[in-house]
Amino acid sequence: MAKETFYITTPIYYPSGNLHIGHAYSTVAGDVIARYKRMQGYDVRYLTGTDEHGQKIQEKAQKAGKTEIEYLDEMIAGIKQLWAKLEISNDDFIRTTEERHKHVVEQVFERLLKQGDIYLGEYEGWYSVPDETYYTESQLVDPQYENGKIIGGKSPDSGHEVELVKEESYFFNISKYTDRLLEFYDQNPDFIQPPSRKNEMINNFIKPGLADLAVSRTSFNWGVHVPSNPKHVVYVWIDALVNYISALGYLSDDESLFNKYWPADIHLMAKEIVRFHSIIWPILLMALDLPLPKKVFAHGWILMKDGKMSKSKGNVVDPNILIDRYGLDATRYYLMRELPFGSDGVFTPEAFVERTNFDLANDLGNLVNRTISMVNKYFDGELPAYQGPLHELDEEMEAMALETVKSYTESMESLQFSVALSTVWKFISRTNKYIDETTPWVLAKDDSQKDMLGNVMAHLVENIRYAAVLLRPFLTHAPKEIFEQLNINNPQFMEFSSLEQYGVLTESIMVTGQPKPIFPRLDSEAEIAYIKESMQPPATEEEKEEIPSKPQIDIKDFDKVEIKAATIIDAEHVKKSDKLLKIQVDLDSEQRQIVSGIAKFYTPDDIIGKKVAVVTNLKPAKLMGQKSEGMILSAEKDGVLTLVSLPSAIPNGAVIK
């Protein structure tokens, strides 16, 4: 009987620089899902790859004095090396410069052109080369004016300067698919996850009206050219999205993989590109009369304390450094445990070291070490066979083991990785407590308690086996080391199916003579300092920029500004704007409405309940038809806004001086 298939993809990464921990986050998450599904018995296909066309790549190659392919080959080698270091179990790696991909892009474009879904027109808009994205005037950050007209500004995504571009372009008529797309959303309510992303797509992009999409460029040459009009290069997002089916051999001489694995079960990506995957990609597939993927999951960003991590800002964490110094398992564990998948999370060196020391070294490592040491001490290394529960504590542990598997499975199916790991660690902690409750050192002094002591050891080893099996999707080394030290070498006992019934070790086994520490304990202070130093690479002369200062003011000028503490009690998107949020704040003596340009950096759910600083004596203004009675303070660096948060102990209405 053929196995049920499962097709999972990551975004294809843009190789304009070295990848950072944020890229590793997406790919490790995909790997965890792939390994978990394989353990469940699925025929899994896991795809990742690189998006290699566009103006930015062309400019990078020229600057390096290389051809585009020479530049790309070097970058892709580094990416593949990182994936190997992370032990990513992908089944394929697609490059958009490969012929198997370009062939599909050409055919798809010509088909859509022939059937009238693509038409020729002219496009004018504000374009950011690094982001490879067009923006409307209302989307620009720090717009520059001359005689009342916008003459420039910055990308809301990265803070890069934009330029006004006007050129002949092909357009994809996505607006005609609006009703069909909304109907698909209604029929498939779990298509976009988390649900907040779905609401964002509908309210911010679909309801205001989908504008037809420019899908070609003529201002550069590096990309897939339109066969019937070669001066046009297919726009990066149409080119890139097709990778999910070109990698399966769609429109090739052999479509067996496509027929077997499509539609995809999960497309994984970071939240900034969910719009392309949840709107443009489904519409493109509808136009091609192909089945749509089952789920699009947009995870949050890994943030630093100073905002979003990005290559262009230079505040990145290099996963190579973490792996080389602390090992792969510690790195993978931190990413999946500390950061709730689907929401933003903050990377801190302190949390990384704490997770390694407390969770891995103390809880798991010590449990394995203590258990093996006791089996050696009390039974000369020969673990007695499992006899069933002999005590109510045994019954409690067995019930908890089965319940842990159930809860873990529910969390894994909904991609709540941190919750799944938390469930496993509760079980590990309970097992450590079981040692203290059963007091093996006391039982060992009484020969009449030999059977009871042996059964305690059997339960400890079985619990450790349960934990090791459940950790296999996350940790690629520790479970193997645990099985080796326990001398569990039957592959069936390492599979997910072996957890359906407690107590499979019905024959005695000989554990290792001397337990080996799986996770060495770290010197917290030294390692926190090391990670912080690695995150602060010295700037080159080329990177250093003098930040202009504003004119000095005296205290009288500052005293004119009234700033008070307030709590955000409600927030929603402003219709027809993807930049503005309408926010209600509680100032103790009154409530006010403030319109703030932070929608690119926060969802309404992100900010409700936050204590913020509000300028309360600004003249009221109207933005997009909405009254704004003040300004919420935020910090800006490289185009990224971060709210200035206040301690919760500060009362609403308190004046900030």
UniProtKB/Swiss-Prot annotation:
One Pfam entry name: tRNA-synt_1g
SUPFAM superfamilies: Anticodon-binding domain of a subclass of class I aminoacyl-tRNA synthetases, Nucleic acid-binding proteins, Nucleotidylyl transferase
GO terms under cellular component: cytoplasm
InterPro entries: aa-tRNA-synth_I_CS (IPR001412), Anticodon_Met (IPR041872), M/V/L/I-tRNA-synth_anticd-bd (IPR013155), Met-tRNA-synth_bsu_C (IPR004495), Met-tRNA_synth (IPR014758), Met-tRNA_synth_2 (IPR023457), Methionyl/Leucyl_tRNA_Synth (IPR015413), MetRS_core (IPR033911)
One example GO MF annotation: ATP binding
Residues that coordinate or bind ATP: K311
Motif ('KMSKS' region): 308-312
Subcellular location: Cytoplasm
Alphabetized UniProt keyword annotations: Aminoacyl-tRNA synthetase, ATP-binding, Cytoplasm, Ligase, Nucleotide-binding, Protein biosynthesis, RNA-binding, tRNA-binding
ATP-binding in keyword set: yes
Catalysed reactions listed for this entry: tRNA(Met) + L-methionine + ATP = L-methionyl-tRNA(Met) + AMP + diphosphate
Short motif 'HIGH' region, span: 13-23
A biological-process GO annotation: methionyl-tRNA aminoacylation
Source taxon at top rank: Bacteria
CDD domains recorded: Anticodon_Ia_Met (cd07957), MetRS_core (cd00814), tRNA_bind_EcMetRS_like (cd02800)
EC number: 6.1.1.10
Xref: Gene3D superfamilies: 2.170.220.10, HUPs, Isoleucyl-tRNA Synthetase, Domain 1, Nucleic acid-binding proteins
Residues of the tRNA-binding domain: 557-657
Family the entry assigns: Belongs to the class-I aminoacyl-tRNA synthetase family. MetG type 2B subfamily.
Chain's role: Is required not only for elongation of protein synthesis but also for the initiation of all mRNA translation through initiator tRNA(fMet) aminoacylation.
The protein's assembly and partners: Homodimer.
NCBIfam families (UniProt xref): metG, metG_C_term, PRK12267.1
Protein name: Methionine--tRNA ligase
Organism, scientific name: Staphylococcus aureus (strain Mu50 / ATCC 700699)
Gene designation per UniProt: metG
